[in-house]
C-alpha cells in the first residue's frame, strides 16, 4: 500500500515539474504578417494626353440639283494625330448575385467603373478624294475630331481596367481643290468646301495604374475606336467653274468613317477616392 502511495506521489511530482519546465521554454515569435496593400479607388477626375494612328474612309457621289450624276466612289486616308482628354469616373461593387437572384452568381460582385469624358484629336490624316465619273481627283485631310461620351468597365485587378465606351463625335475635313485625273492633269477649277460632320462612336480599351512610379495617380490607357459620320450622307457644295463656265447646283454627297488606335498617359486626381 505504501509503495502505491509513493508511486502516485512520484507521478504527481513529475507532472508538476514538467509543467514548470515547459513554462520556462521560450515561446515562438508570432508569424510576421505584412500590412495589407491599400486598395486603389478609381473614383475621381483625370486629364490625359497622347496620340495614335488613324484611318478614314468615305463613300461619295456627285449630284446636280440633288440628282446623282456619278456612281458611288470609295476613298480614304491615314496618318498620325495628337490627343487630349478630360473625364471623371466612379467605382462601385456590382452585386450580381442579389441583382439576378440566381444561385449560380452567388458571391460574384465585380468592381465596376463608369464615367464620362471628352477628348480632342488633331493631326494630318491625309487621303484622296476622287470623282472618276467627272474625271476629278484631289487630296483631302481630316484635320481634327472631338468627342463626348461615357464608358463602363470591369476591374480585372484593382489596377487594371477593361472598358467599352461610346458617344457623340464631330470630325472636321478641310476643303480641297480638284485636278483633272487624266494624263497631263492640271487644275480643274472646281473646289470642295470644308465641312464638319456629325456622328457617333464606339470603342474598347484598357487602362493600367502604374505601381512602380514615385507619383501615385499615373495611368496608361490604350483605346481602339470606330466612328461614323454623315448618317445617310452630307451634301457638300462644289464651287468654281470649268472652262470658264460657272458650276451651280453641284455637290458631293459623302459618308465618312474613321478608325484609330491611341495611347495616353493619364493623371488621376482621385479627389473623391482613397
Task: Say what each PLM segment does.
Residues 2-274:
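Gram-negative outer-membrane beta-barrel domains
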Amino acid at each position: 500500500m505504501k509503495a502505491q502511495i509513493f508511486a502516485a506521489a512520484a507521478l504527481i511530482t513529475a507532472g508538476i515539474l514538467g509543467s514548470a519546465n515547459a513554462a520556462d521554454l521560450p515561446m515562438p515569435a508570432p508569424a510576421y504578417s505584412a500590412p495589407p496593400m491599400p486598395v486603389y479607388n478609381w473614383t475621381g477626375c483625370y486629364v490625359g494626353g497622347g496620340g495614335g494612328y488613324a484611318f478614314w474612309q468615305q463613300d461619295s457621289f456627285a449630284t446636280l440639283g440633288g440628282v446623282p450624276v456619278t456612281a458611288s466612289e470609295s476613298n480614304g486616308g491615314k496618318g498620325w494625330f495628337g490627343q487630349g482628354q478630360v473625364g471623371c469616373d466612379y467605382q462601385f461593387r456590382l452585386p450580381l448575385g442579389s441583382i439576378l437572384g440566381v444561385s449560380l452568381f452567388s458571391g460574384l460582385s465585380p468592381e465596376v467603373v463608369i464615367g464620362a469624358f471628352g477628348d480632342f484629336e488633331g493631326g494630318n490624316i491625309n487621303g484622296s478624294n476622287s470623282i472618276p465619273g467627272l474625271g476629278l481627283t484631289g487630296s483631302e485631310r481630316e484635320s481634327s475630331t472631338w468627342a463626348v461620351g461615357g464608358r463602363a468597365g470591369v476591374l480585372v485587378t484593382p489596377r487594371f481596367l477593361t472598358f467599352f465606351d461610346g458617344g457623340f463625335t464631330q470630325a472636321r475635313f478641310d476643303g480641297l481643290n480638284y485636278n483633272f485625273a487624266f494624263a497631263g492633269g492640271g487644275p480643274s477649277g472646281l473646289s470642295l468646301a470644308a465641312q464638319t460632320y456629325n456622328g457617333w462612336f464606339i470603342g474598347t480599351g484598357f487602362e493600367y495604374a502604374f505601381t512602380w512610379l514615385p507619383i501615385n495617380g499615373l495611368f496608361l490607357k490604350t483605346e481602339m475606336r470606330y466612328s461614323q459620320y454623315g448618317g445617310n450622307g452630307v451634301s457638300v457644295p462644289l464651287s468654281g467653274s470649268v472652262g470658264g463656265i460657272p458650276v451651280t447646283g453641284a455637290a458631293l454627297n459623302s459618308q465618312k468613317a474613321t478608325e484609330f488606335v491611341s495611347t495616353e498617359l493619364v493623371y488621376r486626381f482621385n479627389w473623391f477616392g482613397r
